[in-house]
């Protein structure tokens, strides 16, 4: 059932203002309020000197107004006294520059000192507020790793080296796994190994392993706080919001009660883009509806009833809980100009009227339906934490392209009226008639076996370009590609060419063919494969270039199912859509 609310910062206001705001929140249809996530310095004004009286009063005021609370742990913004006492908790960027205090997320969650202080404030908050009946849920931290750089502080370097020792045992094993003979990079001492960062022309193996280590750090950081909350508030939901790419969000949200995220609509966001982010969020914890912990109070497009449209769209894609950021504008500080429902001088802003109207219209109607199930999806899109780093690092690095491929494949399904889940490699594929794999550089034997079983039993899979050519260390496999999947796709990939479309001012390499009798054609972009069919059917061939006349797209029947392969990164979105819709038709999925 749809539950609406907002983010609120009572540390900014006096009791009279809080009373007024609480009454108005309830009157417009709100039930939930998120507080506390940036209030550490107001809760602990100096080391060990806690001040919670004001927050108790907030709980009581909200309780009187029948408002439930999501209480945020305030660890996204450390107080100045803590930084002054322990400057070593500040993160350090790739070039050795320490963060400047005064912003948020300028601390390193690897730091044992910072974790100790974070645990202490969370323990005190649990002790103070666990008994309130209107304590509805906890939010841990805020937007972990959204703004922060990849930290390279001494604690991170030391932790990374210990992680490598546990994984590889010896330096010889590291050198062999990472192929460090290239660029004279062989290690003779553990202290020589520096933690990596994205897009710095570093060894891709180092970058991949660095991101795996950082992910474990973030998971442990969240778990440290979650364990404290579970002990003191058993049964209460625990969430967090919008973690960045360095966190394996499938793994993270399995440890929490639901997947939580933020979504701010701007003019660049069309409906398919919004649908993608909602489906991605829902897929992080299958079977549990996601929580939208921040969304726009004032959608940027000046379109009548847009907020109502978005509210319905969010709900239709699974968001039972929708909290809007934020209620009342800050009178000062960095985000004083951020969108809100109530302006700096107390006047209602246009978004509040839109919200009131939408809530009044929708809440009674949706209440009749009760709890809605998640959208039924017959198609899955593979999203893998490792793949985004294995795919993008190295010569002609393309960090943003993995996410772009996911969004494009999702949008093509969306355009055909097909709902899809974004799923990790260990998901149960059998619930899907169609599985799209935009890019999956490393194919393990275990994953290959599961994929073969899926197709053998009747599934349809489409594998995109640049898949199945790397090992688990981001090195090339020693056989033809796609790794462990030649029999499934009925082909071998023996070579490839990587290029830029801009390198061909007079027209790029093209390929063409037929999908179910329909003629298709596209220019290539970035990458083409040298495909040698074993027993695959050729759907498209290259029209020009070194691979002229060779296959570009193939189809292979395997057991009861079908395996499609596209050995070219297509620059034409129309072609890509035709390919995906053809795959959907083979899977028996109706198209709009």
PLM regions: where:
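Aromatic-lined substrate-binding rim segments of carbohydrate-active enzymes
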Residues: 19-27, 32-98, 126, 224-232, ...
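Conserved, mostly hydrophobic/aromatic
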Residues: 6, 25, 33, 62, ...
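Carbohydrate-binding surfaces of carbohydrate-active enzymes
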Residues: 190, 235, 253, 264-592
């Amino acid at each position: 059932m749809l539950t609406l609310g907002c983010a609120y910062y009572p540390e900014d206001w006096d009791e009279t203002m809080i009373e007024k705001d609480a009454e108005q929140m309830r009157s417009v249809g709100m039930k939930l309020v998120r507080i506390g996530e940036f209030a550490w310095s107001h809760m602990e004004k100096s080391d060990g000197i806690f001040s919670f009286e004001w927050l108790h009063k907030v709980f009581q005021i909200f309780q009187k107004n029948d408002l439930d609370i999501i209480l945020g742990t305030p660890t996204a913004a450390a107080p100045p006294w803590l930084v002054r006492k322990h400057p070593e908790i500040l993160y350090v960027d790739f070039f050795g520059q320490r963060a400047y205090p005064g912003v948020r997320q300028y601390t390193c969650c690897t730091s044992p000192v910072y974790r100790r202080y974070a645990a202490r404030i969370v323990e005190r908050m649990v002790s103070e507020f666990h008994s309130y009946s209107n304590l509805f849920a906890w939010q841990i931290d805020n937007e972990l790793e959204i703004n922060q750089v990849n930290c390279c502080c001494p604690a991170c370097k030391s932790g990374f080296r210990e992680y490598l020792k546990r994984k590889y045992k010896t330096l010889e094993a590291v050198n062999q796994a990472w192929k460090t003979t290239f660029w004279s990079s062989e290690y003779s001492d553990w202290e020589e190994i520096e933690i990596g960062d994205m897009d710095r022309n570093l060894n891709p193996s180092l970058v991949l392993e660095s991101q795996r280590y950082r992910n474990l750090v973030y998971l442990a950081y969240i778990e440290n706080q979650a364990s404290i909350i579970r002990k003191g508030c058993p049964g209460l939901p625990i969430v967090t919001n919008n973690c960045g790419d360095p966190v394996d969000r499938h793994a993270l949200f399995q440890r929490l009660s639901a997947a939580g995220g933020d979504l701010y609509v701007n003019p660049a966001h069309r409906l398919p883009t919004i649908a993608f982010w909602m489906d991605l969020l829902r897929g992080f914890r299958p079977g549990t509806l996601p929580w939208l912990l921040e969304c726009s109070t004032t959608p940027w497009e000046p379109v009548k009833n847009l907020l109502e449209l978005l509210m319905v769209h969010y709900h239709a894609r699974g968001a039972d809980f929708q909290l809007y950021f934020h209620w009342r504008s800050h009178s000062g500080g960095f985000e004083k100009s951020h969108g809100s429902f109530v302006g700096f001088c107390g006047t209602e802003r246009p978004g509040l009227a839109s919200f009131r109207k939408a809530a009044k219209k929708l809440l009674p109607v949706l209440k009749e339906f009760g709890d809605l199930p998640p959208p039924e999806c017959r198609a899955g899109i593979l999203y893998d934490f490792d793949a985004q780093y294995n795919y993008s690092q190295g010569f002609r690095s393309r960090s943003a392209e993995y996410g772009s491929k996911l969004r494009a494949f999702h949008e093509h399904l969306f355009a055909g009226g097909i709902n899809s889940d974004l799923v990790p490699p260990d998901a149960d594929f059998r619930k899907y008639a169609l599985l799209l794999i935009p890019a999956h550089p490393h194919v393990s034997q275990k994953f290959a076996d599961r994929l073969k079983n899926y197709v053998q039993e009747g599934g349809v899979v489409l594998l995109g370009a640049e898949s199945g050519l790397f090992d688990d260390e981001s090195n090339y496999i020693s056989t033809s590609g796609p790794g462990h999947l030649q029999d499934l796709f009925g082909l071998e990939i023996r070579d490839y060419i990587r290029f830029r479309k801009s390198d061909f001012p007079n027209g790029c390499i093209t390929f063409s063919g037929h999908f179910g009798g329909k003629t298709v054609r596209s220019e290539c972009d970035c990458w083409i494969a040298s495909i040698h069919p074993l027993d695959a059917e050729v759907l498209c061939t290259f029209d020009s270039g070194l691979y002229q006349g060779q296959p570009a797209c193939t189809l292979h029947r395997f057991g009861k199912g079908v395996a499609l392969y596209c050995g070219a990164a297509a620059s034409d979105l129309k072609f890509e859509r035709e390919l995906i819709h053809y795959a959907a038709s083979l899977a028996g999925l109706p198209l709009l």
